[in-house]
Amino acid sequence: MKPYRLFAFTLGLLLSCSTLASAEILALLNYESKPDQPVRREGIAIMDIDPESGNFGKILMEIPLPPDLVAHHIFFNRDRSKAYITALGKSILHVVNLRTFPYRLQAIDVPDCQMGEDLAVSEDNRTWYLTCMGSNNVIMGDALLDKAIKTVSAEEPSVATIRYPHGIAIHNGIDRVLVTSTVSPDMSDAGESIT
């Protein structure tokens, strides 16, 4: 009889813990108005994507963005406590602290970045790297203070030349940051390198 009680107790404990462990599954999506609308809207929508939720597929809240920002991508830091939003229309990067509700945008000035493309965060969650397509730069930032700390120029005659930086990956194990190139902002010239 004792093995049965132990089994029943263990099963009950597992089932109760799995119920307690369930959590929301949310997604952040950037959106903008269709062209030729009299009022341009841009923002971040937070959507419930848990198929078991009664709110599945519903937008739970919106974070408005400036209408001239042209938000491009959303990137998360390593522990998903912050979301970074790159912009094609301004020399600015936004960050949202996802541990503090209500969510608020914090602007990070990146004056050496003409068009913010991709962002990667170091494995220790202390540094972010932002590729800047229009200005041929990579901006290094302090991920704890959320401010730009250094501009790595990819313009010639620097040792590592890359035109129109786009994709970025970090591998701390080999102490490398890899940056790929793309086309120029006006689509007239193609980059063709990885640095």
For the regions a language model picked out, list residue spans one by one.
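Bacterial N-terminal signal peptides
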Residues: 8-18
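Positively charged n-region of N-terminal signal peptides that target proteins for export
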Residues: 1-6
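Predominantly soluble domains enriched in secretory-pathway, periplasmic, or organellar proteins
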Residues: 17, 21-195
